[in-house]
């Protein structure tokens, strides 16, 4: 559900660009992003910082695009958002904290060295996306950039997320690789051993 909410503003932006122009599409993107934030809050009772940053950038640079009738602002918005993400991850690492670990560490147990590598990998990914957007936005036709923004970056992010998932799985502690029934079996065996020990102690006391 959350992924669908994240994708809807992009689809609306793409559809209205094809039907009308970049300025109509940008206005719709601002409204759709605001609605997305509201729905996310009411459904999940919280909004991620990345979503808030993205919305603020859409509102500011989208508004400037419409007010000044200059699509360069909405193009720069993409690069600035990715650059901010990269800077945020870099700062968190310098401060001795992995932002990625902060998001996933409650559900996944990994050594800090692995979290650090994942943090740097996403820093590099966001940096490359920021640079690539500049090239596509200012060297290729607007139609190409819109397709790149909506589909190219989305597919790249999805693929990199999958690669991150594979990397995390390879470094999970062995007990986290066990299926649920194996966990239950192990817990039952531990419980039985504990009961036997307690029974033995009770026998000795008697």
Curated annotation (Swiss-Prot):
* InterPro entries in alphabetical order: YciB (IPR006008)
Cell compartment(s), UniProt = Cell inner membrane
- Basic and acidic residues bias (residue ranges): 178-189
Q: What is its main location?
A: membrane
Task: Identify its membrane topology class.
Answer: Multi-pass membrane protein
Tell me the domain of life: Bacteria
Membrane found in the keyword field: yes
Give the residue ranges for region: Disordered: 178-206
Where, if anywhere, are coiled coils annotated?
none
| Keyword field | Cell inner membrane, Cell membrane, Membrane, Transmembrane, Transmembrane helix
Q: Pfam families under this entry?
A: IspA
Q: Where is the composition biased (Polar residues)?
A: 191-206
PANTHER family to which the protein is assigned, alphabetical = INNER MEMBRANE-SPANNING PROTEIN YCIB, INTRACELLULAR SEPTATION PROTEIN A-RELATED
Family per UniProt? Belongs to the YciB family.
Q: What is the annotated role of this protein in its UniProt record?
A: Plays a role in cell envelope biogenesis, maintenance of cell envelope integrity and membrane homeostasis.
The name of this protein is Inner membrane-spanning protein YciB
Q: Which organism is it from?
A: Vibrio atlanticus (strain LGP32) (Vibrio splendidus (strain Mel32))
- Gene (name only): yciB
């Amino acid at each position: 559900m959350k992924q669908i909410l994240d994708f809807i503003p992009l689809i609306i932006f793409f559809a209205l660009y094809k039907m009308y122009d970049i300025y109509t599409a940008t206005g719709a993107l601002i409204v759709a992003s605001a609605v997305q934030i509201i729905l996310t809050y009411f459904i999940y009772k919280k909004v991620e910082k990345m979503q808030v940053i993205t919305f603020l950038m859409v509102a500011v640079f989208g508004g400037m695009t419409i007010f000044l009738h200059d699509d360069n602002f909405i193009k720069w918005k993409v690069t600035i958002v990715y650059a901010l993400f990269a800077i945020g991850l870099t700062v968190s690492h310098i401060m001795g904290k992995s932002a990625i670990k902060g998001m996933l560490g409650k559900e996944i147990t990994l050594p800090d060295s692995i979290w650090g590598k994942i943090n740097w990998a996403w820093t590099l990914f966001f940096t490359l996306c920021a640079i690539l957007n500049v090239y596509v936005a200012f060297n290729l036709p607007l139609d190409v950039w819109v397709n790149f923004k909506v589909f190219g970056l989305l597919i790249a992010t999805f693929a990199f997320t999958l690669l991150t998932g594979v990397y995390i799985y390879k470094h999970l502690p062995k007990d986290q690789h066990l299926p649920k029934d194996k966990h239950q079996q192990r817990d039952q065996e531990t419980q039985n051993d504990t009961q036997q020990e307690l029974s033995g102690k009770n026998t000795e006391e008697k």
